[in-house]
UniProtKB/Swiss-Prot annotation:
Entry PTM: In natural infection, inactive HEF is matured into HEF1 and HEF2 outside the cell by one or more trypsin-like, arginine-specific endoprotease.
Physiological role: Binds to the N-acetyl-9-O-acetylneuraminic acid residues on the cell surface, bringing about the attachment of the virus particle to the cell. Plays a major role in the determination of host range restriction and virulence. Class I viral fusion protein. Responsible for penetration of the virus into the cell cytoplasm by mediating the fusion of the membrane of the endocytosed virus particle with the endosomal membrane. Low pH in endosomes induce an irreversible conformational change in HEF2, releasing the fusion hydrophobic peptide. Several trimers are required to form a competent fusion pore.
Effect the entry attributes to changing residue 369 to A: Complete loss of esterase activity
Protein's name according to its UniProt entry: Hemagglutinin-esterase-fusion glycoprotein
Localization: Virion membrane; Host cell membrane
Entry EC no(s): 3.1.1.53
Keywords assigned by UniProt, alphabetized: Disulfide bond, Fusion of virus membrane with host endosomal membrane, Fusion of virus membrane with host membrane, Glycoprotein, Hemagglutinin, Host cell membrane, Host membrane, Host-virus interaction, Hydrolase, Membrane, Signal, Transmembrane, Transmembrane helix, Viral attachment to host cell, Viral envelope protein, Viral penetration into host cytoplasm, Virion, Virus endocytosis by host, Virus entry into host cell
Ranges in the topological domain labelled Cytoplasmic: 652-655
Top-rank lineage group of the source organism: Viruses
Membrane topology field: Single-pass type I membrane protein
Residues bearing carbohydrate: 26, 61, 144, 189, 395, 552, 603
Length: 655
């Protein structure tokens, strides 16, 4: 900050000179108006810059996430790191086995990898699924498993988003009173799935050729090892016959396979005694598996004679903590057929963020392992972000982004705003102007007047309901003042502004409330409306904060000048007489150039360091995990002022 000392003519005695502090402002300065004080500045900058989200996945906290993967996250692979799509650091966070997938472990088809997936984390990242795809050619009474896979993955993502821990339960307790044996199927590699298990009755020729109704029991545990189970994902499987004649080759009754809870309520299965057959002309039944979310307890299975499909496994969830879920597209490279069940499942599950490739999978180690695009999309897992969303992740602190971030999103996510709408604050060389509050006269020697804001640290908290409160602290009693009337006027203005902003938000919500239950698009529209309203409210409140900042900085600079004037008066003693605020008369014959340098230029030394760059911090805080609209909004603005902001003094003399 540069000021000059200017000699003013008009004194009767030539040996006496008048020296005054005088601010220097020219056309290169811009004027910034504030509450109670204004500033001239050589530069200006926006309170925040727009941030651009980075594509791909990231996490909010490195210590609270877990991944579930396969060979593409396998650090033990001999071809690692060329075979992986993640770094070594990220691979350590995954539970995996090459060739595995959650669905393979759920059903256990013969000849496939069977891995005990389990782990805990607030945020769960799933990069698996490709090992059960059309390329795997899994039959077992069903050639196309894509729709079952979609339903399975959707339920996994839904339950994972509500749980801290999850685990495969690979051996359910069961009771089968009838004499049955584990069955096999020729179209299932002369074996069968591990879940459900196929049991068949041995019917002797002399007995009823249809056999007896099957009745069996299985128990879903409340705990599996160290993992608590509040809810289980169970596959309820049954055969679908095209007609009664196809099943009734022995003249038996209709087909049924039904699961009951401990109260006798039907929870899953198929009963052709009350439900029609498909009516198609096929001769071979098809197996269908529905996904059930069941509480721990004892369940019974009843089926028509001859065949029994028995649940043997489940996935267990503790349902203790809600958190983000990220699903990564899992597809093969060239030459292998993939499905897009993971993509569809995630997109249809609230709270699930999908990471998708834009190009075909091209591996480095082979055609199917080590894709560069996927590595880039997953590189963010090495870092912590402030915000994660369907649009990408952000680690900058700015509360604004150019485009609306698509939900789901978690953390402290920026709001969409136009760059020109973000308020600007003064920067560079700052010079205060006179204040407006003339009712406060202490200290009397004030050079530039008194402002409506006091000196020191200004703390502004803005919460969901608007301005939450102010903490205004003065550096010292002589550091300026604020009248009760001016303070009340400032608070009244801010309060009115906030009420207007709140009213706009409420109107937007009311317009869409009556449509939400009938229109999914209305939900998305409401989310966008609320985001836009929050952005407008925040921009409006930042404008208020900007005005407070300008006024506070202005009064701080004015106090610095007053302190400088006081210091000059003290150093001068009897050699200079203060005739008006910031002006002195000195006898040139008594106090020569070296004397004046001591008084006014402090022997060419800087008595106080130059003011540092404006220290402003505005922290946008919202509910750590929200989908759609935020549950809260807070802004903290803290301003630190230097005690003195004079970097040099020039003395101009005229006789």
């Amino acid at each position: 900050m540069f000021f000059s000392l200017l000699l003013v003519l008009g004194l009767t005695e030539a040996e006496k000179i008048k020296i005054c502090l005088q601010k220097q402002v020219n056309s290169s300065f811009s004027l910034h108006n504030g509450f109670g004080g204004n500033l001239y500045a050589t530069e200006e900058k926006r309170m925040f810059e727009l941030v651009k989200p980075k594509a791909g996945a990231s996490v909010l906290n490195q210590s609270t996430w877990i991944g579930f993967g396969d060979s593409r996250t396998d650090k033990s692979n001999s071809a690692f790191p060329r075979s992986a799509d993640v770094s070594a650091k990220t691979a350590d966070k995954f539970r995996f086995l090459s060739g595995g997938s959650l669905m393979l472990s759920m059903f256990g088809p013969p000849g496939k990898v069977d891995y005990l997936y389990q782990g805990c984390g607030k945020h769960k990242v799933f990069y698996e699924g490709v090992n059960w795809s059309p390329h795997a050619a899994i039959n077992c009474y069903r050639k196309n498993w894509t729709d079952i896979k979609l339903n399975f993955q959707k339920n996994i993502y839904e339950l994972a988003s509500q749980s801290h821990c999850m685990s495969l339960v690979n051996a359910l307790d069961k009771t089968i009173p009838l004499q049955v044996t584990a069955g096999t199927a020729g179209n299932c590699n002369n074996s069968f799935l591990k879940n459900p298990a196929l049991y068949t009755q041995e019917v002797k020729p002399s007995e009823n050729k249809c056999g007896k109704e099957n009745l069996a029991f299985f128990t879903l545990p409340t705990q599996f090892g160290t993992y608590e189970c509040k809810l289980h994902l169970v596959a309820s499987c049954y055969f679908i016959y095209d007609s009664k004649e196809v099943y009734n080759k022995r003249g038996c009754d209709n087909y049924f396979q039904v699961i009951y809870d401990s109260f006798g309520k039907v929870v899953g299965g198929l009963d052709n005694r009350v439900s029609p057959y498909t009516g198609n002309s096929g001769d071979t039944p098809t197996m269908q598996c529905d996904m059930l979310q069941l509480k721990p307890g004892r369940y019974s299975v009843r089926s028509s004679p001859r065949f029994l499909l028995m649940p043997e496994r489940s996935y267990c969830f503790d349902m203790k903590e809600k958190g983000p879920v990220t699903a990564v597209q899992s597809i093969w490279g060239k030459g292998r057929e993939s499905d897009y069940a993971v993509d569809q499942a995630c997109l249809s599950t609230p709270g699930c963020m999908l990471i998708q490739k834009q190009k075909p999978y091209i591996g480095e180690a082979d055609d199917h392992h080590g894709d560069q695009e996927m590595r880039e999309l997953l590189s963010g897992l090495d870092y912590e972000a402030r915000c994660i969303s369907q649009s990408g992740w952000v680690n900058e602190t700015s509360p604004f982004t150019e485009k609306y971030l698509l939900p789901p999103k978690f953390g402290r996510c920026p709001l969409a705003a136009k760059e020109e709408s973000i308020p600007k604050i003064p920067d560079g060389l700052l010079i205060p102007t006179s204040g407006t509050d003339t009712t406060v006269t202490k200290p009397k020697s004030r050079i530039f007047g008194i402002d409506d804001l006091i000196i020191g640290v200004l703390f502004v908290a803005i919460v969901e309901t608007g301005i939450g409160g102010y903490l205004l602290g003065s550096r010292k009693e002589s550091g300026g003042g604020v009248t009760k009337e001016s303070a009340e006027k400032g608070f009244e203005k801010i309060g009115n502004d906030i009420q207007i902003l709140k009213s706009s938000i409420n109107i937007a919500i009311e317009k869409l409330n009556d449509r939400i239950s009938h229109d999914e698009q209305a939900i998305r529209d409401l989310t966008l409306e609320i985001e836009n309203a929050r952005s407008e409210a925040l921009l409006g409140e930042l404008g208020i904060i900007r005005a407070l900042l300008v006024g506070n900085i202005s009064i701080g600079l004015q106090e610095s000048l007053w302190e400088l004037a006081s210091e000059i008066t003290n150093r001068a003693g009897d050699l200079a007489v203060e005739v008006s605020p910031g002006c002195w008369i000195i006898d040139n014959n008594i106090c020569d150039q070296s004397c004046q340098n001591f008084i006014f230029k402090f022997n060419e030394t800087a008595p106080v360091p130059t003011i540092p760059p404006l220290d402003t911090k505005i922290d946008l805080q919202s509910d750590p995990f929200y989908w759609g609209s935020s549950l809260g909004l807070a802004i903290t603005a803290t301003i630190s002022l230097a005690a003195l902001v004079i970097s040099g003094i020039a003395i101009c003399r005229t006789k």
